[in-house]
Structure formats: structure tokens, C-alpha cells
Amino acid sequence: MQAQRLLMMTMAGALAAAMPATAQTIYPINRAEILEGSHFDFKVEFPNAPASADVNVTINGKPAAEIFGRPTNFIQSEEGQKHSALWLRGASLPAGSYTVEATQGTSKSTVKWEVFATAQPRRAKNVILFIGDGMSVANRTAARILAKGWEEGRYNGELAMDDMPNMALISTSGTDSIVTDSANAAHAYTTGHKSCVNALGVYCAKNALTLDHPKVETIAELAKRRTGMAVGVVTNSEIEDATPASMVAHTRRRSDYNDIVKMFYDVKPDVIMGGGSPNFLAKTTPGSKRTDGEDFIAKFKEAGYTLATTKAEMNAAAAAGTKKLLGLYNTGNIDGAFDLRLAKKGTLSKFPDQPDVVEQTKAAIDMLKGNPEGFLLMVESARIDKYSHSLDWERSVFDTIMLDNAVKVAKDFAGDRNDTLIIVVPDHAHPISIIGTYDDDRPGQLLRDKLGVYADSVPPNYGPVDAEGYPTKVDTSRRLAVVYGSYPDTCDTGRPAMDGERVPAVKGPDGKTNIANEKDCSGPLAARKTGNLPFDANSGVHSADDVILTAMGPGAEKFRGHKPNTYVFRVMAEALALGGK
């Protein structure tokens, strides 16, 4: 036995000696699908900081510089780190298949790229991309129940996003994790490249500074550079937040809000609407979050933008034929539909005239549609996700209904034009499910006593819906039983949080771990739940579940079966014929 162990150790040592050092890393990564003529940064990182004479990089067997038609830049010990780097910023390639090989001594790394062309003439004049942030299947189901009603096993109507001819399952994972965040998930839609958690418009390399990582061009930048299209970005989050920022940003850190504001200014989408005004304000302005002397409110005005800070100002700008609008309606996130329409909580006392996503969508289309070259519009219902993080499903579902109403606005605009591609897709899912209904008339003193499953899951008795499809009463005796599969220590009340967004957990006495919010635990039926997340978690998390995409218009027929999230970019780019040498 000892001899066998010695032999195995000897073989293992010999194998280790024969294996190459840590492999070189090539960006873009293996299996990248790159739009012909789009701009991207080419980078190869070599471990152990070799000299340029000790490495070689080829593309299809030829020197990289020859293929790109430009010299590359080699940096030994980049940023003083223990690696060297070969760079080419702003590269582009004609359509074709490419094999990239990076050699360092006996070590070699290989990646393959597909550079795809887009056919002319362009099929779509306009593209409207709706992103329901965190909108899981249960969100759509619950929205349909609340907005349309249910009777004898059938819904009494369809959602606007359901009534679309094309559908696909979309996988959302990033390069570094099975479960994505909103940054690299939205980045996949707007660039066609995979990336890592927290990244926007970049691959995640070893660079120390967040703005120095290898960049890839966004669809908004492409539309501005290659066409005369107008571009719009609409959200009810802070405009610098991950999803809207994915249209313009290039940073390894999604929280680089001040830099992202500058990136919005550099790209200059024609219509920009959301919250997050403090990062636009000059440092000397009370409430500013900027650390420099820039006043981006003034800069946008000088660039010809009208500023709107209320719904009334937004509508007046649209009615006046404004073509460039900067709409900043809250210092933080815009309040969701549940608070705007029903509970009247959130920040309404401070910002009483905030537009919702539906109103923003209508105003944006009115301002963009006059462009003879068409428009590209991204609309996000951001708080579907934020409320699911808070385990506040009623607010999350109200914002799903709101997104659906915005989709109806777009469908009404598209009508019979046959020139507008409309896509509705989440960026990722949450682990949320409907397991039955709670009925206060069921016997028992515990929340689980009130739960009806299977034959006992009788329909809820929410109040009548208003003209927009929102129930006018939700704190009723029979309610949907909606549960989340990820949660910190918390208490489930089984009822809507009418006094403000739910706070599932708070800091414990040690200041490190989180404990259940006793405010929720004091209710008569509250069920205390031991969390299933790490102890420092204070909210729910995303899931790796596939999400449902629905679409209509020119190019939508390409959505079928299962696709990676990067495919959404490809369909939009092909519909707009954005490729070219």
C-alpha cells in the first residue's frame, strides 16, 4: 500500500510538472458572438508578467495586428501586477469565424469567435425593448389573476405581453456565476456579450480601475454611430441603476453612478427618464452626490435637452413637440404602482407628481416617433425586482401590471405598421411561486391553517379592478398565497403591507447578522421563518431559472425554443441591420 501511495505521488508530481502554468485569458471570451463592425476591446492577459518576446498571439494563424489592420500594444507587468497584457482598444472585424491563440512558452489558450453580419435592408424601423426586472413566471400569472380575473379554470382575459405571437425561454447566467445580477444580465441584452456580476459594457479582466476593463459597444452606441435613429431610456429606478445604465455604460462596478451619468451625457440618448437626480447635480447643490464640480443638469440643458421633474412637466414637454428630454422625477427610485395608486406610501409626500412607467412610455414614444430614421427605446419596470427582494409580492405584481399596460401602449402605437419590433423579457428571475390561497374564514390560529391548497385553493376575492387593471382592494379575506424560495430570517404575514414597502429583516444586536423584522412578527397570523440564506442577507435573492420572452413585429419570429440572453441583442441588431464593415 505504501509503495502504491509513493508511486501515485511520483506520478502526480510528474503530471504537475508537465502541465503548463495558469492559462492566458483572452477577451472577448470563447464562443463570443460579435456583430460585424461593432467596436470591442481586444485583450490577452499573460500570467507571471512575461516580456513581449516570450509570447505570441495569432488570429486564424496570422499575427493579431495583421488581422485587425492596426498595431497592438503590449504592456509588461500591467499596472504593476504579476501579469502582462496585449491590448487593442476599439477593434472591429468583418463577418467570419475566428480562432484566437495566445502562446506563452509551452502554454497555449484558444478561443473561437463568430462575427455575424446583418442583412440589408433593415426590417424594423423601431425597436422597443421592455425589461421586467426580476419578472418571474409567477409575476405574470399573478398579474393575470389580479388584472383579468379567473373563473372555472380560465382567465377572463390575456395580458398584453401574453398576446404576442412569438415566445422563447431565455437563460440568464453570466460568465462567473449561475445566478446573475441585473447588471451583466441587462448587459447581455444591450451588447450581445456575456460578462460577470456587477459589470456593464465590459469584460471582467484584472484591471484595478473599474473603467479600464475591456469594453464592448452597446446597442444604443451602435444606433447612434451607424444610423440616425433616436434613442430612449425609460425606467422607474434611478436612471444610473444597472438596467438603464446598460444602454450606455462601460464599468466593472455598477455602482459608479457619477461616471454613469457622464456616460449618459457622452452617448446622449434623446429621451432619458427615471429617478436619481442627485448624481446629476453640481457638488455645491444641496443634496448632490457628485464628488466633482460637474453640473450635468446644466450640461444637458446646454446640449438642447428640456428638463422635466414632474409628470406635468413631462406631459407638457411631449405636447410641445420636445425631441430631447431629461426627466428626473425622484431623488431615488420612482414609487411603484401599488403606492402611486393604492397605498399612497413611499415618497409620495415629497414627490406627489411622479409619472408611472405607462405614462413615461407614452411620452417617450410621442417624442421619439417623429424621427424619420426610427427609434430604439428601452423601457424597464425596475421595481418588480426591488419589491421581490423585499418579499413584497403585491407591490411586485402591481408593477408587473404596470409594465403590461406600458406594453399595450407600445402595441397600440405599432398597430398595423409592421415596422416595430416589440420584445418583453425579464433580465432574470426570482424564486417566487403561487401555492394556493389564504382564506381568513378557514378554522385555526396560524397562517398555515388559513392556507388552502389543491381543491381548497379557492379564488381570491380582491376588490374590483379599475380601468387600468389594478384591484381597488387587496387586503381582503381571500388572498393569493405567494411564497419566495429565498429569504433571510423573517416573518410572513400573509397580508399586503399597506403601511409601506415590506422590510423583511433588520440588523441584529451584533450589527453583522440580520434578524426578522419584529414589526411583521407582531401580526395575528404571522409565521416566523428561519432564513435559508447566508446570515448577512437582509432580502431575497435572484434565481437561475429561465425566463419567458414574448415578442412581435419584424424579426420576432426568430424567438423560439431556448436561447441564451445574448441572443436578444442579435435579433435586435439584425432587425435594425446594425452590422457592417
Language-model region placement:
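Solvent-exposed serine/threonine-rich low-complexity stretches and specific carbohydrate-binding patches
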Residues: 60-81
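A post-motif C-terminal structural segment
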Residues: 42, 70-73, 85, 135-187, ...
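Gram-negative bacterial Sec-dependent N-terminal signal peptides
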Residues: 1-22
